[in-house]
Curated annotation (Swiss-Prot):
Species name: Mus musculus (Mouse)
Annotated gene: Spock3
Molecular function, one GO term: peptidase inhibitor activity
Taxonomic lineage of the native organism: Eukaryota, Metazoa, Chordata, Craniata, Vertebrata
Signal peptide segment: 1-22
Pfam family, one: Thyroglobulin_1
The name this protein goes by in its record: Testican-3
Span of domain Thyroglobulin type-1: 314-380
Record: glycosylation sites: 387, 392
Region annotation Disordered: where it falls in the sequence: 393-436
Processing and modification events after translation: Contains chondroitin sulfate and heparan sulfate O-linked oligosaccharides.
Kazal-like domain: residues covered: 133-185
SMART domains attached to this UniProt entry: KAZAL, TY
Length: 436
């Protein structure tokens, strides 16, 4: 009896082993416990990164869904081979460095950022993750067509109007077309200038270029602040450009400089400046950046960057007076510091605050000369131009080591540094031809 029982146990064990082996073979052959959803497997999530390769560099200022967000395989392949449902379209798709390829269906490959992919997963128990679906499932995808780039109101370039509308749908915000072509939008005058016609640019045209670039940087800065949470910069603190020492660079200009300065040396070389797209028709844009390079060393320092834009602003003293009048309205506030302007709208060398009885010396752009503030009338016989006018060939070199903020600041509150926002989308920029 015991022998019969033992024999039955051995047979039962063998039958169970064969059954499990057969079930495993069926599963390997194509049977799936997840209902066919390949994204439910953790193994897939670790292997899709093999498609995350890109030849060359990626423009850091492009949106995640724009510029061929829906990628396709090589159109030179035979038609029947390209549409073979047995082949993974991601095998023939190259995504940017910070994106991965996923298969939307048998014929559509989709490049999506790591961040969006992570946000589309939710924890279900332990370490198992369940796919919730693409964030753009309700947004209409764009057909494959020739690129017709447009510049969006968020400061980003899109390969077509459809890509712009798709981006707006994915992000759930309003994005309109600012102009045809890539950002920044050219002026009306530059559209009528031939490609091969060389001419000198006027001061007015330089000012228009600076204003357009400043508006573009502001749109990028605000767009980045709205889309991402602020994160601390992973860079040496002493290598960062302290924008508080130069008020003109405390906002978007300083933010853009830190974005472009990828090696943190406080100098922009040709490869770093190449991240800014230049319209071939806008000859004055190239000339503008050439004018910023005071030392003619093919490098733009943080000082040169800030003062180059500062020179192209409206007369600073008149601008400050207008701002004061707008803030206080009809009533004049007691104790308010009122700057003294010359006939051209720039600051006079001697500035005084009658309420506190102090005077100090400034350059024509209103930057205070360190150590010149005294009680009483200051001796500012020299026309200071060192910090704003590089034409003099001399200027004061600011460094991050100098903690002279209390002496530099006027009778105003301290200016707080803007939060830097260089999160997950700090991709490598496309390298264009240098223009210096």
């Amino acid at each position: 009896m015991l022998k019969v029982s033992a024999l039955l146990c051995v047979c039962a064990a063998a039958w169970c082993s064969q059954t499990l082996a057969a079930a495993a073979a069926v599963a390997v052959a194509g049977g799936r416990s997840d209902g066919g959803n390949f994204l439910d497997e953790k193994q897939w999530l670790t292997t899709i990164s093999q498609y995350d390769k890109e030849v060359g560099q990626w423009n850091k200022f492009r949106d995640e869904v724009e510029d061929d967000y829906f990628r396709t395989w090589n159109p030179g392949k035979p038609f029947d081979q390209a549409l073979d449902p047995a082949k993974d379209p991601c095998l023939k798709t190259k995504c940017s460095r910070h994106k991965v390829c996923i298969t939307q269906d048998a014929q559509t490959a989709l490049c999506i950022s790591h961040r969006r992919l992570t946000h589309s997963m939710k924890e279900v128990g332990g370490s198992h993750k369940q796919w919730r679906g693409l964030p753009s499932s309700t947004c209409k995808p764009c057909p494959i067509a020739y690129a017709s780039p447009v510049c969006g109101s968020d400061g980003h370039s899109y390969s077509s109007q459809c890509k712009l509308e798709y981006q707006a749908c994915v992000l759930g915000k309003q994005i309109s077309i600012k102009c045809e072509g890539r950002c920044p939008c050219p002026s009306d005058k530059s559209m009528n200038i031939g490609r091969n016609v060389k001419r000198a640019c006027s001061d007015l045209e330089f000012r228009e270029v600076a204003n357009r670039l400043r508006d573009w940087f502001k749109a990028l800065h605000e767009s980045g602040s709205q889309n991402k949470k602020t994160k601390a910069l992973l860079r040496p603190e002493r290598s960062r450009f302290d924008t508080s020492i130069l008020p003109i660079c405390k906002d978007s200009l300083g933010w853009m400089f830190n974005r472009l300065d990828t090696n943190y040396d406080l100098l922009l070389d040709q490869s770093e400046l190449g991240s800014i797209y230049l319209d071939k028709n806008e000859q004055c844009t190239k000339a503008f950046f050439n004018s910023c390079d005071t030392y003619k060393d093919s490098l733009i320092s943080n000082n040169e960057w800030c003062y180059c834009f500062q020179r192209q602003q409206d007369p600073p003293c008149h601008t400050e007076l207008s701002n004061i009048q707008k803030r206080q309205g009809i009533k004049k506030l007691l104790g308010q510091y009122i700057p003294l302007c010359d006939e051209d709208g720039y600051y006079k060398p001697t500035q005084c605050h009658g309420s506190v009885g102090q005077c100090w010396c400034v350059d024509r752009y209103g930057n205070e000369v360190v150590g010149s503030r005294i009680n009483g009338v200051a001796d500012c016989a020299i026309d200071f131009e060192i910090s704003g006018d590089f034409a003099s060939g001399d200027f004061r070199e600011w460094t991050d080591d100098e903690g002279e903020e209390d002496d530099i600041m006027n009778d105003k509150d301290d200016i707080e540094d803007d939060d830097e926002d260089e999160g997950d989308d700090d991709d490598d920029g496309d390298v264009h031809d240098g223009y210096i």
